[in-house]
């Protein structure tokens, strides 16, 4: 479990009006976190929310868009997150956020992952408007579903308990690894592998960034520790 003490400060006021997408050479615009950006979480008559309008502007300028969500236990997901999905190319969230947005319980009563509900939630996020790819990550690994209906699974790196110093930032590290792969045009399985290795690297330090290392060093963690058991029999 993690406890966050957060002061929104300037994030509560930022509207994105200072961004000029026509001048950037970037390929991907990543926006995070929905539910923590007060100004962008406000309603917008045309797009649903101001965050959705900002993502739409990025898409109109030719950028691929990605959005992340904070794990907030509230009923705001329908009002704030869903409108943005229509303007998101890559939706990368954890199982709690996917479940809250799509309306599924992805954990069974005993805490195990419900892979059927997970598939349904990913499909629902695509139906809600995500353009290309949904990635759902969790301590056991990650799952991806494409707009074409292709499914991909990647178990987590099997780090020994003594090597885990903290879990803060692991989801963001996975997201960064996946986005790196998408930016470079890698296949989805390689993107998930890279994301999981980045998450494993993050786990080795109690801070959000102290465990990060070179791509090769992160990938070497998988070679050293191998992977957790397959999430579904078909992976074996």
Predicted regions and their residues:
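Conserved post-catalytic alpha-helical subdomain immediately downstream of the catalytic base
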Residues: 158-235
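Ribokinase/PfkB-type carbohydrate-kinase core domain
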Residues: 1-152, 157, 208-223, 227-236
């Amino acid at each position: 479990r993690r406890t966050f003490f957060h002061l929104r400060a300037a994030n509560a006021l930022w509207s994105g009006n200072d961004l000029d997408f026509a001048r950037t050479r970037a390929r991907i615009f990543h926006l995070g976190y929905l539910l923590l950006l007060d100004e962008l979480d406000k309603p917008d008559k045309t797009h649903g929310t101001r965050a959705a309008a900002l993502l739409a502007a990025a898409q109109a300028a030719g950028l691929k868009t990605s959005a992340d969500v904070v794990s907030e236990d509230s009923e705001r997901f329908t009002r704030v997150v869903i409108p943005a999905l229509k303007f998101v190319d890559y939706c990368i969230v954890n199982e709690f956020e996917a479940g809250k947005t799509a309306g599924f319980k992805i954990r069974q009563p005993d805490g195990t992952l419900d892979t059927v509900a997970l598939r349904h939630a990913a499909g629902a996020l695509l139906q809600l408007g995500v353009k290309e790819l949904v990635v759902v990550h969790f301590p056991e690994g990650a799952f991806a579903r494409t707009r074409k209906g292709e499914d991909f699974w990647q178990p987590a790196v099997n780090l020994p308990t003594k090597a885990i110093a903290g879990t803060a930032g692991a989801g963001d590290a996975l997201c960064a690894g996946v986005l790196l792969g998408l930016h470079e045009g890698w296949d989805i399985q390689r993107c998930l592998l890279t994301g999981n290795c980045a998450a494993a690297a993050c786990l080795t330090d109690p801070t959000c960034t102290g465990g990060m290392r070179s791509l090769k060093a992160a990938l070497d963690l998988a070679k050293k520790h191998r992977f957790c058991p397959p999430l579904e029999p078909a992976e074996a």
